[in-house]
């Protein structure tokens, strides 16, 4: 059965944010992913986090993806990682996986993600 879609029939209740609120009040998301040549998934995931209302979004991706991320979403704080690194404090939610494959770089990112035990994580 096919029906016409009517936007007026949808009641979306988006809570109003206070005029004196700060983006840091609405959660900090870290997206880990995007190995060399597969940055699109991680870039789109970070963009989706923004559209869902996250206050601050960080993307840690392969260094070859940094320029594309910053061109598409300059509001996403993008860091190029090529070696082992530590996930910094202050993050509320971690998403690990978009754009990873079966290679050494992806395994290193995954190893860091599974050490997270004090944050909400989707791996």
What are these regions (language model features)?
Residues 1-123:
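Small-residue (G/A/S/T)-rich helix-start motifs and N-terminal tracts that mark the onset
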